[in-house]
């Protein structure tokens, strides 16, 4: 039997359900209101060591500042990142962006241009790979000396202690130098890219502590913990354009990129070039009296009204207010009455993931895999990963934090339509990896990947379930219809077997098969069914007739591939269980992450069991564990769901700051996936029954939860 026949809701039930959700999007058990502050406070981050890879962070979703144990970037050059900080190196002489036109590939007798690397045009291909890239706005740290004037080094730190107050979004740091205590408070303004810093120490009065500001040039590096080149002195400019008794402003120029840094201090201090330094891009704020230094530092692509900047204390107050509002909004979960010994670590991961995702991934653009910690893939975001970074916000009833970045779909719709037209197809083909404008990074996987294509239909459906209005329909109409039209045109009619197939060429979720031979990948088939089915529902809601072509493709789309009574990665795959049990086990995602269009639940359960036994858990990615957890929950195995969320693989670990493994470090899809799975397991899904249906009913789990939104 087909699962989806059990999940389709009649028109009357759909209206009743939507009426209920419009009044109160709540999934709440009988135990009542949760003490949210107690849940958050018991996972307060407390560290007493120097971490060289893992920063503590403050941020607002668009901007983040990573710090070492001193509360600034004193000994470890962590990064200051934003969603607007993009840079491109100059093009090679004689090379134009228009030189790249794609690479034609035979697709069922048609030569279709795909956005893959062009070996005949290596210069422009290489330039497009690396540009644009995100850059580090600058480094801020303490410049400290001993009584004899020699510089303080990391090994001189004594009794370091740092606490991240998650409830307020403020970092409190302290340590000793030569027996004297130094205290640093660090906070981020919730509404602008500005930091508030407060420093207190007898060393301030002794003239032995200042704050340095060091600006790097953009670098060619990728997958590096430190972003920027601090030695390329002659390739950029740092110009002090104002310098008063209590403020200063710096204009930064890197090739065609400009931005501003502004400082405002509330305690006596002077600002200028750090003269002992060889770098013209290093400056020093030096207190001139008292034991305190309090300042604000702001970054912007536009000139800053320095006199209107908030003080450090005002930023502290605003941060505390905004973070309390965040924690009190949306859903919450409390596992503290459970007796399973894993409850505390699971709850810690849940709380810290909510913090680091709000800091790094609640901005005006979809996030890159490493958020605003460092650069991976040159800082660009991946369209197929938007689901894993953001769906949790909708399920945790914080839709607005996801919605603020989804404008990329209508914004990039015209260029995506052009991309499809160049390929001889209708509709819109979404890119795979891009920055703040729609230009694909030419790469084999990027040009041939397709599982990002139905995403906007899924997001639109989430939005409509939360906001079933004409306004929502109008908002998503063109995106949904053009996404589906491309999907229908992409499917190839196999006349010999009277069916539609996907690929070749196609790069699938796991990216580990031969794209020129792969046909009918299971996850993509399931998602195509979901996307076309849902798009037809949208046509009906819009008062439009069903599109006959879409129904034809739906009705004749190839079934999910089966070998030896279990699902397999793609149709006809050879040696599936001896050669391909690594990378993403996407065959488990068709019923869990997705609602199960075309799935036989008996076959699925056998498949999930086999994957659990035979897949190489140290050769997959962080979001694969939540994907399997959702599959386990939806198929009636909540014990396995918990096992997946607490798996001991090196690919799914969460450090002291909540930063996760699972890919190039840190890997935020691990955090987003965890929150998505937990929301589903607590709040349920279409067709689920009972309270917290994804948690075990073995007497070891007591799950208090409220305000979750059921998953599709």
Where are these regions (language model features)?
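C-terminal motif of bacterial Sec signal peptides marking the signal peptidase cleavage site
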Residues: 25-27
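Active-site core of glycosidic bond-cleaving carbohydrate-active enzymes
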Residues: 73, 92, 382-418, 436-439, ...
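Acidic/His metal-coordination segments adjacent to aromatic residues that form catalytic metal sites
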Residues: 366-380, 430-448, 503-521, 651-663
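Sec-dependent N-terminal signal peptides
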Residues: 16-23
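Acidic/polar, glycine-enriched structural segments that form the non-catalytic walls/loops
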Residues: 29-380, 399, 410-415
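Bacterial N-terminal signal peptides that target proteins for export
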Residues: 2-16
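Catalytic cores of secreted or luminal carbohydrate-active enzymes
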Residues: 129-153, 537, 672-708
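Acidic/histidine-rich catalytic neighborhood
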Residues: 486-538
């Amino acid at each position: 039997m087909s699962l989806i026949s059990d999940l389709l809701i009649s028109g009357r039930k759909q209206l009743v359900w939507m009426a209920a959700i419009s009044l109160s999007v709540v999934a709440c058990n009988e135990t009542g209101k949760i003490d949210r502050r107690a849940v958050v406070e018991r996972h307060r981050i407390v560290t007493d060591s120097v971490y060289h890879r893992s920063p503590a962070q403050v941020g607002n979703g668009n901007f983040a500042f990573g710090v070492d144990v001193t509360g600034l970037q004193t000994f470890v050059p962590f990064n200051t990142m934003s969603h607007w900080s993009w840079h491109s190196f100059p093009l090679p002489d004689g090379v134009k962006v228009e030189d790249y036109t794609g690479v034609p590939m035979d697709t069922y007798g048609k030569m279709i241009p795909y956005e893959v690397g062009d070996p005949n045009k290596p210069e422009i291909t290489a330039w497009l790979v690396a540009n644009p890239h995100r850059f580090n706005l600058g480094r801020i740290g303490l410049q400290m000396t001993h009584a004899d004037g020699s510089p303080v080094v990391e090994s001189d730190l004594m009794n370091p202690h740092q606490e991240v107050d998650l409830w307020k979004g403020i970092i409190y740091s302290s340590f000793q130098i030569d027996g004297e205590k130094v205290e640093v408070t660090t906070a981020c303004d919730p509404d602008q890219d500005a930091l508030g810093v407060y420093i207190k120490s007898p060393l301030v009065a002794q003239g032995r502590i200042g704050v340095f500001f060091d600006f790097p040039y953009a670098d060619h590096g990728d997958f590096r913990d430190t972003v920027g080149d601090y030695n390329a002195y002659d390739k950029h400019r740092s110009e002090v354009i104002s310098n008063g008794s209590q403020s200063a402003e710096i204009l930064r120029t890197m090739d065609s990129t400009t931005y501003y840094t502004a400082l405002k201090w509330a305690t006596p201090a002077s600002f200028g070039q750090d003269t002992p330094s060889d770098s013209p891009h290093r400056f020093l704020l030096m207190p001139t009296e008292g034991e305190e230094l309090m300042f604000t530092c702001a970054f912007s692509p536009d000139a800053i009204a320095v006199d209107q900047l908030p003080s450090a204390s005002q930023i502290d107050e605003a941060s505390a207010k905004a973070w309390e509002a965040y924690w009190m909004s949306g859903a919450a979960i409390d596992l503290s009455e459970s007796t399973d010994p894993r409850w505390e670590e699971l709850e810690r991961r849940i709380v810290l993931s909510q913090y680091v995702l709000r800091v790094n991934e609640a901005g005006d653009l979809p996030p890159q895999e490493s958020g605003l910690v460092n650069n991976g893939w040159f800082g660009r975001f991946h369209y197929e990963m938007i689901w894993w970074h953001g769906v949790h916000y909708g399920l945790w009833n914080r839709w607005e934090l996801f919605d603020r970045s989804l404008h990329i779909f209508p914004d990039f719709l015209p260029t995506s339509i052009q991309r499809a037209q160049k390929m001889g197809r209708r509709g819109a083909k979404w890119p795979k990896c891009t920055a703040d404008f729609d230009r694909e990074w030419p790469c084999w996987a990027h040009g041939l990947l397709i599982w990002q294509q139905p995403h906007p239909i899924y997001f639109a459906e989430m939005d409509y379930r939360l906001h079933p209005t004409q306004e929502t329909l109008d908002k998503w109409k063109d995106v949904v219809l053009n996404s589906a039209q491309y999907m229908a045109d992409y499917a190839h009619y196999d006349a010999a077997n009277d069916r539609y197939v996907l690929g070749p060429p196609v790069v699938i979720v796991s990216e580990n098969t031969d794209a020129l031979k792969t046909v009918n990948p299971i996850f993509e088939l399931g998602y195509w069914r979901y996307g076309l089915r849902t798009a037809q529902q949208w046509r009906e809601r819009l008062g439009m007739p069903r599109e006959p072509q879409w129904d034809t493709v739906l009705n004749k789309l190839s079934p999910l591939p089966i070998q030896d009574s279990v699902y397999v990665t793609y149709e006809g795959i050879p040696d599936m269980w001896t050669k391909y049990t690594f990378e993403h086990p996407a065959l488990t995602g068709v019923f869990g992450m997705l609602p199960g269009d075309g799935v036989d639940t008996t076959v699925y359960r056998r498949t999930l069991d086999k994957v659990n036994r035979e897949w190489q858990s140290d050769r997959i990615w962080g979001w694969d564990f939540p994907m399997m957890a959702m599959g386990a929950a939806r198929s009636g195995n909540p014990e396995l769901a918990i096992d997946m969320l607490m798996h001991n693989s090196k690919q799914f670990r969460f450090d002291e700051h909540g930063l996760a493994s699972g890919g190039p470090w840190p890997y935020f899809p691990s955090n987003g996936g965890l929150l998505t799975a937990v929301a589903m397991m607590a709040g349920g899904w279409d067709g689920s029954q009972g309270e917290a249906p994804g948690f075990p009913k073995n007497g070891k789990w007591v799950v208090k939860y409220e305000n979750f939104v059921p998953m599709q």
